[in-house]
């Protein structure tokens, strides 16, 4: 697949599942995120989102409006972003950056009461930290322990 011109975000649907299940993630990335096939069973308040490049799934993440959000912010209008991944075969094409740049307008249209997105990124995951900073997320100064070490809590105001 050539580098796509049109990037959009959409709610995961049944038609996306076969491609999402085949995503390839190298071991050095799997330690920091979950494979999309591990997120097939979502609970109320979790919204699986697909990054589409010219209509083809290339990325995935989950937006949460669950009690879990309170672990990261006291803002009752915030959402939590987790498990961002880009299929390894589609990496280095700008899809993560462009998908995250589309996040604000997607949330404003689909979740109009949301005014903040928070996330936690492992302190060793420098590429992800740089991505989030490039698209406008800021380090809140809060720290938490994750499964493999310290995580930085970042946010973006919408």
Task: List the predicted regions and their residue ranges.
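Conserved beta-strand-loop-alpha-helix junction that forms the acyl-donor binding cleft
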Residues: 113-129, 145-150, 155-158
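Glycine-rich acyl-CoA binding loop
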Residues: 92-100
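Conserved active-site alpha-helix within GNAT-family acetyltransferase domains
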Residues: 97, 123-141
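Solvent-exposed beta-strand sheet faces enriched in polar/charged residues
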Residues: 64, 118-120, 140
């Amino acid at each position: 697949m050539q580098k796509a011109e049109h990037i959009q975000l959409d709610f995961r649907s049944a038609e996306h599942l076969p491609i999402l299940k085949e995503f390839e993630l190298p071991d050095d990335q799997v330690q920091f995120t979950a494979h999309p096939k591990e997120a097939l069973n979502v609970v109320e308040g979790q919204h699986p989102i697909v990054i589409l490049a010219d209509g083809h799934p290339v990325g995935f993440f989950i937006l949460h409006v669950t009690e879990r959000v309170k672990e990261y912010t006291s803002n009752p209008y915030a959402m939590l972003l987790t498990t961002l991944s880009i299929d390894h075969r589609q990496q280095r094409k700008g899809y993560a950056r462009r998908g995250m740049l589309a996040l604000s307008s997607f949330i404003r249209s689909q979740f109009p009461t949301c005014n903040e997105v928070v996330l936690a990124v492992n302190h060793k995951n420098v590429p992800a930290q740089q991505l989030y900073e490039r698209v406008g997320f800021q380090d809140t100064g809060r720290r938490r322990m994750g499964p493999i070490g310290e995580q930085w809590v970042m946010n973006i105001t919408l």
